[in-house]
A protein has these predicted regions:
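Alpha-helical multi-pass membrane segments and their bilayer interfacial helix-loop junctions
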Residues: 1-405
Length: 405
């Protein structure tokens, strides 16, 4: 939470005698935004310094003798690591982590530059995997979120580079990222790290399906396994962060099925997985997911699985069923938001409902309505829905606050 939020909500706590005025001032004092801003400066400075060094070396690289090049790489990397450790021992954690991060960047840059110096030809991303592994080890050594994010970025970009440049998927990179950084995510229970891990994992699953040219539905098996893991996390903010990206992926897939599915032209071989194996895998994940939800007393959230219903295997009515799934899921998110009095969830559910409505509008009217009229009516519908739902949200939240007095 931020200082601004505490300053806004704190007086109400004092008024209800939940805390005293002195306690309120002490709580506000804990959220000094100035200190957070100053703490970020070394990290930003490390990024700029790293870019400056890389650009300088790249501009003059060809004019530097080979032995001096190798010495520069070793000296710069060692200096950054040594400086980082020194500042960390002095208690200047931000600056120490910033220099350690520069050491990690220097290590990766050194791998590339040494390969160029000695004309080494790479046929896979083993060197990048080693770089990511080094970042993972540093993450555990210093328990740093910044080093975690850099390592996660290295693995994600390396995987993309492998599929794009070498046309092969690196299972080793995925395994090291999923096990190493995944366990760190599980330990820290940090919302930001969990969001980033979930996004990277889903993207890498997409790369796997595309690279192997597998039926697209296989994508949802590892993705929903990630969702299922979120049901066994006690901290709900972390669980939501782990599950939101898989649900967004399923929601987008349902939209695509509504807008673009055509039985006459669609290639089922590119989409449909083997029914027995795929549906069996989903049912198994659903069972484990529901068990976790019941343990956490969140059984009603099993309704989120409606987006994964395998309507695509039916012979007719596929678009209508996926459209209904979109609306039901949107209503569910709205309903849970109102029940929990969670403003973010209400806003998100509102956005999903508006999006579902526009998908239905586009599906039903695009082919036969004049295009200018289509956009005019669509805009009016969007504005009307937005006004109505926002008005309804404010009314319900106001009633909820009134009931607390």
């Amino acid at each position: 939470m931020s200082r601004k939020w505490v300053e806004k909500e704190g007086p109400r706590w004092v008024e209800k005698e939940i805390i005293t005025r002195e306690q309120y001032e002490q709580i506000v004092g804990l959220y000094d935004d100035g200190k957070h801003a100053i703490g970020i400066l070394p990290l930003l400075g490390s990024v700029l310094l790293g870019l400056g060094i890389l650009s300088f070396v790249a501009a003059n690289w060809q004019d530097i003798p080979q032995l001096l090049r190798l010495s520069m790489i070793i000296v710069i990397m060692t200096a950054f690591y040594t400086g980082g450790e020194w500042f960390l021992r002095k208690g200047q954690d931000k600056l120490g982590i910033a220099l350690t991060a520069l050491g990690l960047v220097s290590f990766g840059g050194g791998i590339v530059l040494v390969g160029q110096m000695f004309h080494l030809v790479a046929y896979d991303i083993t060197s990048f995997t080693v770089w990511g592994l080094a970042g993972t080890l540093l993450t555990y050594m210093y328990r740093s979120r910044f080093l975690y994010l850099i390592s996660l970025l290295i693995f994600t970009v390396a995987q993309w580079y492998s599929t794009e440049q070498f046309h092969q998927y690196s299972y080793a990179a995925l395994a090291i990222m999923a096990i190493g950084l995944g366990y760190f995510t599980w330990q820290r229970q940090n919302t930001l790290l969990t969001w980033c891990f979930s996004l990277s994992f889903v993207l890498q699953c997409m790369m796997l399906i595309v690279d192997k040219d597998w039926a697209f539905l296989w994508f949802f098996i590892p993705v929903m396994a990630l969702y299922t893991a979120g049901d066994w996390i006690k901290d709900r903010s972390t669980g939501y962060a782990l599950q939101t990206v898989p649900l967004i992926a399923a929601y987008i897939f349902a939209i695509v099925m509504v807008l673009m599915w055509d039985e006459r032209t669609s290639s089922l071989d590119k989409l449909l997985a083997m029914p027995a194996a795929y549906i069996g895998g989903l049912v198994l994940l659903l069972a484990v997911s529901v068990a976790g939800k019941l343990k956490q007393q969140r059984g009603s959230s099993a309704f989120e699985w409606i987006l994964l219903a395998p309507f695509v295997y039916l012979s007719a009515g596929i678009e209508v069923l996926y459209l209904l799934a979109l609306f039901f899921f949107s209503f569910y998110v709205l309903w849970r938001g109102y029940i929990e009095q969670w403003r973010f969830k209400i806003n998100f559910g509102t956005l999903l409902f508006i999006c579902s409505t526009m998908v239905a509008y586009g599906k039903l009217t695009w082919d036969f309505m004049d295009k200018s009229l289509f956009f005019i009516l669509g805009g009016l519908l969007l504005l009307t829905l937005s006004w109505f739902l926002n008005r309804r949200k404010k009314q319900i939240l106001a009633d909820a606050k009134g009931g607390e007095h």
